Amino acid sequence: MASLIYRQLLANSYTVDLSDEIENIGYAKSKNVTINPGPFAQTGYTPVNWGPGEVNDSTTVEPILDGPYQPTNFNPPVNYWMLLSPLNAGVVVEGTNSIDRWLATVLVEPNVLTTVRTYTLFGVQEQISVENNSTTKWKFINLIKTTLSGNFTLYSTLLSEPKLHGIMKHGGQLWVYNGETQTLLLQDYVTSNYDSLTMTSFCDFYIIPRSQESTCTEYINNGLPPIQNTRNVVSVSISSRNIILNRAQVNKDIVISKTSLWKEVQYNRDITIRFRFANAIIKSGGLGYKWSEISFKPANYQYSYTRDGEEITAHTTCSVNGVNDFSFNGGSNPTDFLISRYEVIKENSYVYVDYWDDSQAFRNMVYVRSLAANLNDVLCTGGDYTFALPVGQWPVMTGGAVMLHAAGVTLSTQFTDFVSLNSLRFRFSLSVEEPYFSITRTRVTRLYGLPAVNPNNNRDYYEIAGRFSLISLVPSNDDYQTPIMNSVTVRQDLERQLGELREEFNTLSQEIAVSQLIDLALLPLDMFSMVSGIKSSIDAAKSMASNVMKKFKKSKLASSISTLTNSLSDASSSVSRNSSIRSVSSSVSAWTDVSNQLTDISNSVNSISTQTSTISRRLRLKEIATQTEGMNFDDISAAVLKTKIDKSTQIAANNIPDIITEASEKFIPNRAYRVISNDNVFEASTDGRFFAYKVGTFEGIPFDVQKFADLVTDSPVISAIIDFKTLKNLNDNYGITREQAFNLLRSDPRVLREFINQDNPIIKNRIEQLILQCRL
């Protein structure tokens, strides 16, 4: 393995002088470390909601009950109910097309015998005969005349206890409610000059879309919601509806707070989500009558749309969770039709849509709070799929439908073939809808849900409209760059060379091929092969090796090995215990005791995160001492170092010791290690994150810190080349077998090479991220 170079150096330089050890310990305690997460940091955790933020309203999500509005004269929109809410008896509404229809509605209180009342209709005093025999319900009387000078006649009536009445323009006619509450009917007026028909309301009213007609009927039967009957609800002018037409403010960047270096910006965006399902239909071998699997697969979709005049390029990834497995067996004969397993999503399932676009909001999606979204529902219906049998009538799976309801939004990361993108994951819950699905010419019928056989129903995509809002922490100056200055020391010339060499090394990370890196990491590199690409290195090999050893023995890695060697002889003397909580260090082991570091943080070692972080900082030494057949981080580190040395144009013999020593300390700073016990995996990283899960399902289990400490002492420690998040993402998007999972957990280089040769974007992205961490 490539990490042999570090083993050779440690074998000859683990002993250090006391003065060097004191200097290194003091340096380690005073060193400030800043981790740059990079432009594509993993942000898989739900953001903390620090405050309510601001979410502007827009017309993309239409309200059910819009109002109340003040009495006015206007031309009501088509296909919208005008829900009238009068308080007193009298004229409620007038309407006319100014040609051949004059319509009016008056309200009569309960317990009124037949009488003649005078109403002012269209500016004229009219004598109208009215009555209301009901003791509890108010009576709406709809009147009509065909000439301006004619007399009004009764057209229809409505008895309503809540005193609510509805009028709507639809289909070239004017529609009203008539009859009695709980048994309502719809009555239409035939009218000409339909578009110019205007209404004059003499009471407060609401606007309800025709798509919510059932809700409007419910209000007329039982009354408005309680919140509408309080004094806190004040009617406004109908002209306020026109404000929504100016929707530029919905897509806006608002500076919430600002300091000299940082600012909080709230991004409000309208959003159009387009997605599609993907599936896999696998036919069994044999005579052609049997299918082994019909399943959902993740689907990527890229598209463009216009947002406030701006052309937006968006990318979505659709996946499902909680699928239901169905099967059909037509018999045991080889020519009997059979589907071993086909997936169906139902009420217990979820659909995830990861969304990213090229707008400013997604360029700063690293530190995020107050994330909120509001989306419309979408109906997904299944299409037909014909099972082509060699002989006989062909069965057809047809139908099925589900409604997607927005159920939440979190941050996520999308992986493409070239880059990983910080994105929003919209989660949708499901409800089953008509029609049901069935398989013709079989007994499978009247089942509900959406099967995976043809989930898009020959559509290019499904579309959802809505909006989202988030607050992101970004630099105050968009053009700000941190200045880089060379340190002025007695080694000024060498430091300048090292600075230029570091910059060159860091830029070379983009040129390293992942597939070649894996092969190089498996080679047993030694000092000679490491520097074989440098001119005149053969002649100076002996002196160069001595210089590297001398420099390397002062490194933190060599210092830690020396401390470990001393602590192995008397591990129990350096164990610190806590009286209230059993510390990790209660395992009498030099691997779980971090020497004097643990004493310095004895007051904070109570948390699991601190304990696992304390252990994981020592696991590299444990791994070096107990080499396994799997690949480790030092193999990748040494392979990257070798590749960069070969590619470098500025490398020289005098700066090789500094480069190798610095690479051993700084390459891949964020590492995770794992131990395996039967079917359970315990994984901890140097930044304090920890996971415990099952191998087969990647289902989380409680993290037993004491068991983890014991396993670290007795079991091999494995570099988590493919960490838990990457494994879970790989399983969710592609699906992996139990054997593949075990091999990836053991960092088997053969399996890693197979995934890379298959151009798997998730595995390639993980290895590329490790390469990018190999910085000086």
Curated annotation (Swiss-Prot):
Motif placement: YGL motif: 448-450
Residue window of motif KID motif: 644-646
GO annotation, biological process: permeabilization of host organelle membrane involved in viral entry into host cell; virion attachment to host cell
Alphabetized UniProt keyword annotations: Capsid protein, Coiled coil, Disulfide bond, Hemagglutinin, Host cell membrane, Host cytoplasm, Host cytoskeleton, Host endoplasmic reticulum, Host membrane, Host-virus interaction, Membrane, Outer capsid protein, Viral attachment to host cell, Viral penetration into host cytoplasm, Viral penetration via permeabilization of host membrane, Virion, Virus entry into host cell
Gene3D superfamilies the record matches: 1.20.5.170, 2.60.120.200
Sites marked Cleavage: R231, N232, R241, N242, R247, A248
Note: This strain probably does not use sialic acid to attach to the host cell. In group A rotaviruses, VP4 defines the P serotype.
Family in the record: Belongs to the rotavirus VP4 family.
Name of protein: Outer capsid protein VP4
Organism encoding this protein: Rotavirus A (isolate RVA/Equine/United Kingdom/H2/1976/G3P4[12])
Source lineage: Viruses, Riboviria, Orthornavirae, Duplornaviricota, Resentoviricetes
